[in-house]
Amino acid sequence: MNPPVLHLHWLWLLLGCAGIQALLAVDFIFVPLNFSLPYEDKFYHALAHALPAAWFFMLYRRRFERRALLVAFLLLALFGELLQPLSPYHTFDVWDIFANLAGIGLGWTLAHSRIGTVLERFDLFLASSFKA
């Protein structure tokens, strides 16, 4: 069975791309913050990868699309961390890679749960609300 077509796919894709843009900005541009709790930065690494991953896994629901996205997000997590030493403000940390992977796993899990239909339901609500 094919997943339903989203009426505002272009809008959701644009918002997802903005999420990836924000992730890259955090990885390479922004100056790191001083965290007060131990391993707090690992939480933010996981969150920064979970949100765009879950978004795109909700946006593309076919099996091959999700698997391709999974590979893309895994590569982004790995190479993003490996390239961080090229930035003057960031350093390489293998535990950050694990936090990134945990975030992608969380995004995958959320997209395969009941939460994974939120985007579809919201799209249907907006499409029916503004239909002429």
Residue ranges, per PLM feature:
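Bulky hydrophobic segments
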Residues: 1-132
